[in-house]
Amino acid sequence: MFKTNTIITDNITLNEFYNKCIKEKVLAVDTEFIRDNTYYPSLCLIQIAGENFAAAIDPLSGLEMQPIWDLLANEKILKVFHAARQDIEIFLHLTGEIPKPIYDTQIAAMFCGLGDQVGYEKLVSNFLDLSINKENQFTNWLQRPLTKNQIEYAISDVTHLIKIYPLILKLIKDLNREDWVQKETKYLTNKNLYIIDPLTAWEKIKIKQTNRETLNYLKYLASWREIECKKRNIPRNRLIRDDVLANIANLKPREIEKLKKIRGISNKLSIDDCYQIIETLKQSSKYNSDQWPHINKTYKKNNIDKCSLELLKLLLMYCSEKSGLAQKLIADTEDLRNVLHTPHKNHEIFIGWRNKVFGNYVRTLLDGKLAFSVENNKIKLIKF
């Protein structure tokens, strides 16, 4: 028989729990996972809370998990997460679908003036005036059996969250920002956000200034690594580190013996892996220069006036404080550089609510019709 605030390890209890959940309009959901040694996160626990009950579901106990997948897909029940992105990634990988509908309290908190990427601890402190016991924060959730304290810690994440939801919802309604939160949350439900195209994997590798030919080799080496790591379910750097991959692209060895002499090549790299790397380099060399990747980011350091960028940062800080919105939610440094590089393009900051709280000011500043002054130790804007 299902008892609240316990861990579920058998199918009968899971079905009883499911029958309680489907009567709810709102469920708080959280997960515990480990990603140290795998490409995909290893799901260790799912915590779910309704208004007056909660449980942790153990996916490692051989449960038939379909009732949980059905709950997550049930569009009549709102699923409330905090910092939902990683949870969604797990569920998408396991089921092929994203939970619907969802509400992310971290996104909502950023619209309430609580700062950038509000942590769960801060959220609980602000809304419930409680402190979280961090004793089990770094638990190895793959270990079994879990202790009573571990289970209670995991479940408390959702029992707090289900109480926070109506409070933060009221605050968002009072601020008349429901549509803003909804639009930002919708971004999380785009499957493309979680699917990495192997041919774009190279873009996340931090490298020093290089030429397009080397980038071409890096593009296909990174693509090969991405595909292999997915197949083997191992971290990228477990196969080959980023810096080593960049060195291979730069040196372009055509023989296995020369490849193995490159610093950082692991002895664990099999002969077959070495052969595939050499073959990837050979195939990469067949592309014409007009097919090589473009170095789109060179303008950032060379052609952007630093003073102009700092002015936009100051304006962003001002607009953030004035609106009570997190700076990161409005724009980041990359956005500001892009605006300075192509000011007439319809950038994200010139659309919707961002335009209202920030974009309009940016246009006025770029048109030379906005100035800064200081009055009583506070920044003041002057429009011409």
Predicted regions: what they are:
Residues K148, I168-F384:
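Accessory DNA-binding and partner-docking regions appended to nucleic-acid-acting proteins
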Residues M1-L27, T31:
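N-terminal accessory regions of nucleic-acid-interacting proteins
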Residues F33-Y40:
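Single-stranded nucleic-acid-binding OB-fold domains
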Residues A28, N37, L45-I48:
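Non-catalytic, usually N-terminal nucleic-acid engagement modules in DNA/RNA processing proteins
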Residues Q47, N52-P67, L71-I162, L169, ...:
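Active-site-proximal helix-loop-helix substrate-binding element of RNase H-like nuclease domains
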